[in-house]
């Protein structure tokens, strides 16, 4: 089954083989790349998946999305052309042994975070601090018994750089790709000051979360579970032991797929 993670800035695709219970990461497409030239990059990837997996018409897919409406329209139309029916998953108050910490408005928790919580609970099976460093840095506390204790949302590295570029006259044009990552240091020019400041903000948030975890988990052991493209670098800057899972969200989608087929 095709698994889809439609994020803020790119969509990621994976394949779940129900016979072997293996998840294979297929790739990712930045949204800007396919919106600029309609949906050709997306269609190319989907056609490759359909042909290589020998999918039949009316094949099912399952996904979650925090993407913009325009992106979702492109995704849905491209998938429909190939006869792929997508079951988009929503956040629930309780599912697969996990209880949503957003008790007043559970649906306000992003479905990407919810899928990661489901995947973490199934994979880790103990207290976990989940650090997902993508477009935004999200941090969630999850008890071994499945209780979600809440979390934080922090602007990611590129969002911080963009905010400075938009809000000031002379600080435009810095991207994550420009940054040389050698750990924290005092900036000796404006460029270094900005990039090191972003690094300090992100690692500082994670460090505070780790410190709070002792209280939230009643001084019981916990794992630091890391996902997202920037996560491993940030953790190494902090010199903290962690477990990395590139497919955490897809593991959550796989659990939902099990329910579709049951």
UniProtKB/Swiss-Prot annotation:
EC number: 2.7.1.33
List of residues binding K(+): 132
Cellular component aspect of the GO annotation: cytoplasm
Native organism taxonomy: Bacteria, Pseudomonadati, Pseudomonadota, Gammaproteobacteria, Alteromonadales
Cofactor note: A monovalent cation. Ammonium or potassium.
Record has Nucleotide-binding as a keyword: yes
Kinase found in the keyword field: yes
Function: Catalyzes the phosphorylation of pantothenate (Pan), the first step in CoA biosynthesis.
Chief localisation class: cytoplasm
Positions contributing to ATP binding: 5-12, 135
Cofactor needs: NH4(+); K(+)
Listed name of the protein: Type III pantothenate kinase
Residues reported in the UniProt entry to bind substrate: 102, 110-113, 190
Top enzyme category: transferase
Top-level taxonomic group: Bacteria
Active site per database record: 112
InterPro entries documented for this protein: ATPase_NBD (IPR043129), Type_III_PanK (IPR004619)
Pathway where it operates: Cofactor biosynthesis; coenzyme A biosynthesis; CoA from (R)-pantothenate: step 1/5
Protein's cellular compartments: Cytoplasm
Subunit text: Homodimer.
Pfam families with a match to the protein in the record: Pan_kinase
Protein family: Belongs to the type III pantothenate kinase family.
GO biological processes: coenzyme A biosynthetic process
């Amino acid at each position: 089954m095709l698994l889809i993670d439609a994020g803020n800035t790119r969509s990621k695709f994976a394949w779940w083989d129900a016979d072997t219970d293996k998840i294979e990461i297929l790739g990712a497409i930045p949204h800007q790349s396919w919106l600029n030239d309609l949906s050709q990059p997306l269609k190319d990837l989907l056609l490759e998946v359909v042909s290589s997996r020998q999918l039949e018409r009316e094949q099912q897919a399952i996904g979650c999305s925090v993407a913009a409406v325009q992106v979702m329209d492109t995704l849905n139309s491209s998938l429909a052309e190939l006869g792929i029916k997508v079951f988009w998953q929503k956040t629930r108050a309780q599912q697969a042994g996990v209880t949503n910490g957003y008790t007043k408005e559970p649906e306000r928790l992003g479905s990407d975070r919810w899928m990661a919580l489901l995947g973490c609970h199934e994979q880790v099976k103990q207290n976990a601090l989940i650090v997902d460093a993508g477009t935004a840095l999200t941090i969630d506390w999850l008890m071994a018994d499945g209780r979600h204790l809440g979390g934080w949302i922090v602007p990611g590295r590129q969002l911080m750089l963009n905010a400075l570029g938009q809000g000031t006259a002379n600080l435009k044009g810095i991207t994550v790709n420009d940054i040389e990552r050698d750990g924290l240091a005092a900036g000796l020019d404006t460029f270094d000051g900005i990039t090191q400041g972003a690094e300090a903000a992100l690692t500082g948030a994670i460090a505070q979360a780790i410190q709070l975890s002792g209280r939230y988990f009643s001084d019981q052991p916990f794992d630091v579970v890391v996902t997202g493209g920037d996560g491993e670098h940030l953790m190494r800057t902090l010199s903290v032991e962690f477990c990395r899972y590139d497919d955490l969200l897809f593991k959550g989608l796989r659990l939902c797929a099990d329910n579709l087929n049951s």
